[in-house]
Amino acid sequence: MEYVKLGRSDLVSSVVALGGGGPSRLGLSTGSTRGEAIALIRRAFDLGITMFDSKGIIGGADEIIGEALRPVRQQVLISTKVNLAPAPGLVSRYRMLHRVAARTAETLGLVADAAAVRSHVERTLRALASDRLEVLHLHAVVPGQYAKAVERALPVLQRLKADGLIRAIGITESFTRDPGHAMLTRALDEDFPDVVMTGFNMLNRSARSSVLPAAANRGVGVMGMFAVRQGLRSEADLVRALHRGPGALPVDEAAQRTAAFMRLLRDWGVPSLSHAAYRYCRHERGIDVILVGTGNPTHLEQNVAAALAGPLPEPVLRAVEALT
């Protein structure tokens, strides 16, 4: 494993972080037991991963991450989130209510008040059985929420940091709703986060010209998400992404472009599309840590191996630039 200082914070993290959110939720969404999820987290630690990211949903990944890491808590970093829907402590207990409330809050620009944010953070600490958080993010903030989030929630996070309950303040974007990074660009202009979480992958490289240089100039740590989640799990996913995404290629052209790209990967010894995706993001200048999310121990090992491989061959990099 390789390790990196996370921007201007004093945190030193593995270059790969295990995410507890996303579609898999450590395998809990795909049939894994609590014990299997704990074993996966501990396997990640054995592989050298020291950053573990959760979604701040009480009764879910936070509690499992806390239990799994208790024996090695002093050796790891925990990153988690507070959602900004009103009454975050309530909605975080129920996944469907969480989704509905978060979507409504995004649409209407609603933000929890300061007391609700602090209460949620305290509940998260209890769920993790921890006395501190290394990184606490304002979660999935959309442009319409940003001003209220800074007004209401940021002072709470600053007090928590001053009290030693959190070591770094972060903010994550809603990549699917804000693919051009308008919110993070504004946050970096105002220079309050220590860490940001941004979407970046082979199909949407726009952070390269906005978030990444701004973060570098400010000394802000960058965690990269969505390395494979948008159309990069399989050949069929890539065809759909090229057909339905920006540019909307005719399906036959999308299939031909995908087939040519997959042939190139094979010719250069790149074993899979997801391997290429993780490797690509890991070596993007300006991204400190990439998130991997899985419930499968074999996939975890493969993803870590991909991230720790060298940069992709130059012909493959040129082909990535030509994909979209």
Language model: regions and residue ranges:
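Active-site mouth loops of central-metabolism enzymes
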Residues: 22-35, 102-118, 141-147, 175-178
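Conserved, mostly hydrophobic/aromatic
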Residues: 6, 18, 37, 52, ...
